[in-house]
């Protein structure tokens, strides 16, 4: 069988930013609420206005969710272009505080990678 070995963890460094956590930071209300927020606040026209060909484009934005849920260091990881990364960054920065990540039962500061898909319809 498999064994679980508990390794004692030293006190979590106050300013450490986790990349892997047991419980990911999430938008308040979960994925459904996040989808609703994006539909209301993301300008989906940015891609077509920017001249993107019809199709589906996914941009990935990385940011830090602090222990109090505030968002910082919002940066695009992709370079699809047509203004999509800038629009995704704007929408995330303007949103509410997130529910912070947890590690070993403690609220921690953690990175979050968030894909956002833009769809450009055929005219």
Could you describe each region identified by the protein language model?
Residues 1-123:
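Charge-biased low-complexity segments
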